Amino acid sequence: MAVSCLIVDDNHEFLRAARDLLEREGISVIGVASTGAQARRSCRELKPDVALIDIDLGEENGFDIARELAGGEGAAQARVILISTYAEDDFADMIADSPALSFLPKSGLSGAAIRGILRRAGGEP
């Protein structure tokens, strides 16, 4: 069974490229969002196995959205992986304090990396 994924990023070019890459690698990208409101709605409606959330969403904070989605009740709840072009060390304390399963640099984004994180966190769907 393919892992279903929601990608949350305010860069539309990245959304297209990430969707294409992940779908070629066997991840089912069931939705994309560029704002927190879209992410919350998509998470409730689509119920992805995992949400990839950019740390820097312009005026919005990816950490706040991650907390909302990972801590959501019922259908809004999702497992979260934080993504960024920034180095993990730049946000190490904030990442450690977040409910996210892990952090992935955008340059390291792959289907295998996502499946590996989900496996280590308690099972791939």
Question: Where do the PLM segments sit?
Answer:
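Acidic catalytic/metal-coordinating carboxylates
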Residues: 35-38, 61-64
